[in-house]
A protein has these predicted regions:
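Mechanochemical coupling/switch segment within NTP-driven translocation systems
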Residues: 60-74
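Active-site activation/catalytic loop segments of kinase-like enzymes and analogous catalytic loops
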Residues: 114-146, 161-177
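Short, charged, low-complexity patches
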Residues: 4, 8-12, 115, 129, ...
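Short, mixed-charge aromatic SLiMs
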Residues: 37-46, 141-147, 184-201
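ATP/Mg2+ or Mg2+-diphosphate-binding catalytic cores
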Residues: 50-51, 167-213
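A cross-family kinase active-site recognition segment
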Residues: 2-59, 81-83, 181-184
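All-alpha amphipathic helical-bundle segments outside canonical DNA-binding/catalytic cores
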Residues: 148-158
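Active-site acidic catalytic loop and adjacent metal/ATP-binding pocket
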Residues: 72-118
Length: 213
């Protein structure tokens, strides 16, 4: 179930505990969440390996260039916070429930800002996301302090996730299992929808950020 319907505060407590432990030392062999690694490298791989259809390439190239420039601005504004050891892919599908929330699937763990483990738990209209955030942070701060400046990163992180996921699939496309498992990928329709989603993100980056009351 989504955290808005079940225990957002409890999930917040679990993540606060995770980050409190994660802040005690650093990863030695895991990646760091960066604009260069998740955004620029993803864009370059897709363009250099001709995944984008010719008729869509100019739009994708220009749009992603503008997005990454905008994201880099936002990133610099928030670049003075600690990098924590994170779950990295914390969404409702990676939370099991027993007596409380149980995080699973740590294969995407990496170093980055705390908000990376929180933003995917928010959904719905702005008022709903605001309420979910308040519940999450209320539980989170029982164990670890949250820097509200990181809320500026939410739409930047959403954009990087979109770009990184496309490149993740593309890098594995020579594996016969992937075209069978993801038949919708690497079609003109897929790339048209990606461009539309990225255009929406360019607008979202200029919208007011969520706030803690």
């Amino acid at each position: 179930q989504h955290p808005r319907t079940r225990g957002a505060r409890s999930i917040g407590r679990t993540l606060g505990q995770l980050h409190s432990i994660g802040a005690r030392s650093r990863f030695q062999h895991r990646p760091r969440l960066t604009v260069a690694g998740h955004g620029e490298a993803s864009r370059r791989f897709l363009l250099d390996n001709d995944f984008i259809p010719d008729e869509l390439r100019p739009a994708y190239e220009t749009l992603t260039r503008d997005l990454l420039a905008r994201i880099a601005q936002v990133w610099r504004m928030c670049d003075n916070g600690p990098l924590l050891r994170l779950h990295g892919d914390c969404h409702a599908g990676n939370i099991l429930w027993r007596e409380g929330p149980l995080l699973v699937d740590f294969d995407d763990c990496l170093a980055g800002p705390a908000i990376q483990d929180l933003w995917m738990l928010l959904s719905g209209e702005r008022a709903q996301r605001q309420a979910q955030l308040a519940e999450l942070i209320d539980g989170y701060e029982m164990f670890y302090d949250f820097n509200p400046a990181e809320l500026q990163l939410v739409e930047a992180l959403r954009t990087l996730r979109l770009m990184h996921y496309s490149a993740w699939l593309a890098r594995r496309w020579d594996d016969p299992a992937f075209p069978r498992a993801f038949p919708w990928f690497n079609t003109p329709r897929y790339w048209s929808e990606q461009i539309l989603a990225l255009r929406e993100q360019l607008a979202a980056l200029d919208e007011p950020t969520l706030r803690l009351f």
